[in-house]
Amino acid sequence: MPVVDYTARPPSEGEQMDQHYRAAWDGLTAPGAPFAWSVTDVRGVPTRTYDAAPPNLALLWAGSVAHGDADYLVYQDERMSYAEAHAQVDALASHLAAIGVGHGDRVALAMRNYPEWVLGYWATLKLGAAVVGLNAWWTGPEMEFGLADSSPRALLCDGERLDGVVPYLEALRADGPMHVVGVRLDPDAGLPVDAVRWEDAVTGAADLPVAPMADIGPEDDLCIFYTSGTTGHPKGAVLTHRGAASNLLNLAFWQTMAGAAQDMAVAAGEPPTGSDKQSGESYPGSVLAVPLFHVTGCNCCLHPVTAVGGRLTLMHRWNPEVALELIERERPSTFTGVPTMVRELINSPDFDRRDTSSLAHLGGGGAAVQPDLVQKIEERIEGRPSTGYGLTEVNGVISINANQFFMAKPASAGSPCPVMETRIVGEDGTDQPTGGHGELWVRGGNVFRGYLNRPEANAESLTDGWFHTGDIGYLDEDGFLFLVDRAKDMVLRSGENVYCAEVEAAIYQHPAIAEAAAFAVPDERHGEVVGVAVVLLPDADLAADALRDHTRALISGFKVPEHVWFLDDPLPRNANGKFVKRTLRDQLVGTPAR
């Protein structure tokens, strides 16, 4: 990390926290410390890895048996303890082993956020097989693609997904057997050949030998998650046990380091603003509002909640009022959702009527967190705002920003985690200096193996272990990462790059805005200009020119939206909660704007 000299003048509060932050960081990563790391050869590349990382994630699940009767999974009016979950995982693993699933095989999961997704995940890992997390929003043909691409030995899916897959099963099985376990099927629903209901698979396992835990190495495949691309077929990112274990320790490191830095500041008589904020009584765990078939839901929520013996409350679908009801009832310490969900939660008319005092952290990842949202979180809950920047291809997070650090630099994605090397690479392929903009490249123990069956994509995105994120950003003098935008989410206006995230951040500072998405609109004179789709808060009133005046006061004139569409319905999103700008462009460009 860069060294900053504060001896020439008294340090500000932010600089004081920075000194404690660096001291805590250095102490926790020193040789022999809990988060010490070494350089290891991983796939022929020198790679930073944590010394204390577990060799596989199946050990994490095995250790959770110690939590016994504590609540593990909550879904609507259903509750399942750790002991009950272990019994079902063992039974399902025995069933899968009996039909031939073993080390190196794959098991696909295709369902909503049901408890069975979690149980199927751990049962698959116990056998040394890899999970294929299929997008539950996919259509039948998209499911066919994912199954053909990944060739799973078994498919665990709910009734809605099964109906979409059945027409393709015979063709898919031409290349090999694919056993089906149906989840939460209607009692009178039929079953295809070589299929069984979940409850029959679990109860029938009583007559089968108990499947032992496989011998699993760090570089064995853990899961395949498909990236949420907006063009062409999605790509299956192959994640390893080493990568997921590294991500788990990245999350634990930041929480430990931030707490240690605050304790140092208080002990030095320099308590930072907000350090006296205390959440109410809570239980370790989270209300999960994002899908389990993405790394935010699985690697960044399911894994750490399980590691601490916490309670995971699953939502069938996103609804801010239901989420607030669950937070009040279950009293989780965290809420896991993308920033648009956090904004809807705070804007909900139910927010002030519900008890959210249990939340120690309210934040999310998957998209940029606008500075105005950071301030709203700080003002409206007892917990602290937090965010993480990451990608499917890195098993979760690259950097984290939370607590006082977030308030000091709310526009930053945080400091890259200890095992993450970073480069900012310009268009000419050279590394950029501090403050210079370029594409972020990362290398570390949590970087994925590559894309399944995509050698050309791997050649384009991986260079000597460095993953090209496709995100444009820069590092400041303190080593904090700032994201400017996606490399392909820009407007090129008369040769000037306009980053959509900057436009959106300015628009969101207007109090009438509920949702906003900026995108490129073709223009004969400028090549491209900025267009924006906007949804207003209930009972709000805003004219397009007033929005432009507001935006012009915050950003350069050439970045101000020339086309404004006010929409009554929520903006379209993909399964991970991100706005689908391609859909917006297709729907709006060419229609009257204001």
Task: Map each language-model feature to its residues.
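Conserved pre-ATP/AMP-binding loop-to-beta segment of ANL
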Residues: 203-226, 233, 277-285
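Structural core segment of the AMP-binding/adenylate-forming
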Residues: 2-32, 98-99, 129-204, 538-540
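Gly/Ser/Thr-rich phosphate-binding loop
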Residues: 307-310, 329-337, 346-408, 421
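Conserved AMP-binding A3 loop
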Residues: 81-83, 222-254, 258-265
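Conserved AMP-binding/adenylation subdomain of ANL enzymes
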Residues: 245-289, 293-333, 348
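AMP-binding/adenylate-forming catalytic core of the ANL superfamily
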Residues: 138, 144-145, 155-157, 444, ...
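Conserved beta-loop-beta connector loops within the AMP-binding
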Residues: 389, 409, 421-441, 474-478, ...
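Conserved AMP-binding/adenylate-forming core of the ANL superfamily
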Residues: 52-53, 69-114, 118-122, 139-144
